[in-house]
């Protein structure tokens, strides 16, 4: 991968990409952690919230081709990353304005714009670091991933302080996070224009060996896609409504205390990802991928029946820490020349499909059950029904063949 305006400022590049990851993953949790519970307080029903979350995921998927297009049009990856940060600033700003003006259509529009913003960072951040650090990118990628997990954990707390800390729900205070995203976006753009950027890359044509390997591996890739889609559907459905569940079912008022509890649950991935990576090196990729899926589902059911946040912590630890392990298994069982294509399929079809379907199914089921059991029990029933898919996903791992090679599991996604 070519580089232009190369500087020795590796630390600056790592700092900017890490801050970008922190902001991107943090903003992604403002939507289900802050915006959706506020909408629920405003008597927006589960079906509407589920559809809104599903459209957010769908738009994020449809916006994916905009990322390489933006890279080509601007002439660099970091410039595209800066534009993605500015998109986050715009989307969160529109949401804040919608709450201030009591215009729900602006809040909805902001959530959908956030879907576009969410498409940018992840395919760009690793490309920038891999280009700058080359074969020594492992540590940089790990630090970068840790900042993503940290942002995901801290933003619900920080946003709760801003929005709920004044004693009333004041959604307009989300403008602070819009401003931060814009400032970092501008900083990235200035740095990329003056010092360093990663040039666009031309894709290579597929070889005959590539086509032959594809024919042999297509069934396996399809199986891995189904496994991941089912698991991600459950995960997305639960993540969409977990904030509402804490508020309505566990009666945790929307306050700084609510944000602290949600942050604690989400922080589980900070220890979970290296722990699962370490365990998988000892007991095997497939087994750990299967067991972690069962563990996530079992702990979540225990959380539903007991209301204990300890069970929620461990459930989310296995939920949020499993994806790097799945990607490692894909890299192990698929021929080397197909790894990039296979991981792309798993990401774009399984993860995106799960995100779209999971929120939609959970929201519609919650709305359906609410007519019979009431709002609180309706949401509880919906989550218990959806989590069954996780057990199916866990069982399907027995059909995946033993990997012919063992690759190191990335500690942070």
PLM regions: where:
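C-terminal ends and interior cores of transmembrane alpha-helices
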Residues: 86-101, 294-307
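Helix-loop-helix hairpin linking two adjacent transmembrane segments in secondary transporters
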Residues: 135, 143-195
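Helix-to-loop junctions at the C-terminal end of transmembrane segments
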Residues: 63-76, 272-284, 366
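Cytoplasmic helix-loop-helix junction between adjacent transmembrane helices
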Residues: 110-148
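A membrane-interface helix-boundary motif in multi-pass transporters
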Residues: 163-180, 364-390
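Extracytoplasmic gate region of multi-pass secondary transporters
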Residues: 31-32, 220-270, 358
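C-terminal transmembrane helical hairpin of 12-TM major facilitator-type secondary transporters
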Residues: 285-329
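A late C-terminal transmembrane helix in Major Facilitator Superfamily
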Residues: 336-371
